[in-house]
Amino acid sequence: MYKNLVLVDGEIMPAKEAAVSVHDRGHQFGDGVFEIVPVYNGRCFALLPHMDNLFESVIKVKIPAVYTIEELIEFHEALIAESGIENGEIYTQITRGTADYGLAFPEMSVPQLTMTIVETDREVLSAKRESGVNIITTEDNRWQLCNVNTLNRLPEVLARQKARESNAFDTLFIRENGKITESTESSFMVIKDEMIWTHPDNNLVHKNITRRLIKERLAPDIDMQVIEKAFDMEFVLKAEEAFLCGPRCEIMPVTKIDRKFIGSGVGKVVPQLQAAFKAFVERECPAK
């Protein structure tokens, strides 16, 4: 049995004892950023790239850096060790801190760090990774800085609820011009003409370490090329395969979108990527 622990400003404590001020700007305005780090076999997966993502968001929203990357790495390792969690994820959140109500940056406030660790059963999704999932689409009405992991995630919340009400696994966002960006918490890719296609890594999509891993390591391992180019549903419906990728779903085949079949099912390339991903995780996070 693991311990239900959290970290607040460098101090680890039982979750039931943790508290954050109602005047915290993250609570009042969503004035903060976050990052999610997967944990395998008691080890953080791709921790340094995830911390680079976090600091990039911190810099873009102009929150002063209180902790170094090295300190945050130590906090992650300590939280895993003291909680006893072997497989799960760590959610890190940094806000601008507590201040009187007002939209402009406060002159006197100290950024607040909170970290939570939860246990996850990845076997729950294993059957879906073999059979594939169905997803739906919705209008992408998010702001123009999706590459910043801010706490303002109401569009994703509503889109994910829409998926739940439709008995779908997730929801794809589509811009006004018809181009597909990503899902609520994963990148979206398709296999077409023996290449992997995905939306350009720009301000319209979240930074995604799994996507980066596929582009830089996994795709080359199976002799595939990743093309970053925006595409629409007409393009997707002519693809051989489609899949989501992210820290939670890993590599998840998509077999239907809005009740329309993609290719002939899971396909041949996605299982190869899944095997390459599993091997990479086992090398990076070996069992202790």
Model-derived regions: residue spans:
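Helix-start/capping segments and mature chain N-termini
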Residues: 1-78, 102-288
